[in-house]
Amino acid sequence: MQHASQLQIPATLAEAVRPDTCALIVYDMQVGILRQLPHGGDVLARVLKVVEAARTAGVRIVFMRHMSLPKKLAGVFQTRQMMLWQSKTSPDEVQPWFLRDSPGFALAPELAVREDEAILDKITMSAFEGTPLAIALRDCGLNSFVICGIATEIGIEPTVRHGADLGFIPVLVEDACGAGDQESGARALANMRHMGDAMICSVDELAAAWR
């Protein structure tokens, strides 16, 4: 641990992921998202290892879900986004994929969320925008978060950058994150490495730090 102006500055992975100062954010591991990725099962298996390690270490866990609004409330941005992602040329052709309580909206059942773990819903890419996540972490005295899930280039990178801007130390579990587009995912990882906001580790390295 480094020290500056009476502050403790984590210098190693183990220092950054201390169970009393960090949380685990499991990003959008939903049925309807996992089935869009050819390697979704592999990502889920590695995320489950991260979740189990966090539970064993007593780390606080927050699961994020992406939620669609009904078409009448979707607004300009969400409607345009649906048209792009669904390759439609008219707003009349799109369908909200992740309406609350729809089959695709649900988290993967293997995650088996526990009573002392939170589920937060969002309509944005950053897990911090429009959710109580930052308030909850700060109120628990946490200054870092570990993140894994899907998709690296769509929501995880924005969450890492937003979290860093809010003063948290992001820790990205590289092999427990999946990309919708492999080239874009690799580019997002390269960008995060270049910026240096996040510590980047593997599932095995994280599990060792939590032992």
Model features per residue range: what roles?
Residues 29, 66, 175:
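Active-site loop/turn elements of alpha/beta-hydrolase fold enzymes
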Residues 30-35:
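Short acidic, Gly/Ser-rich segments with clustered Asp/Glu that frequently serve as metal-coordination loops
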Residues 36, 66, 73-74, 156, ...:
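Short Asp/Glu-rich motifs
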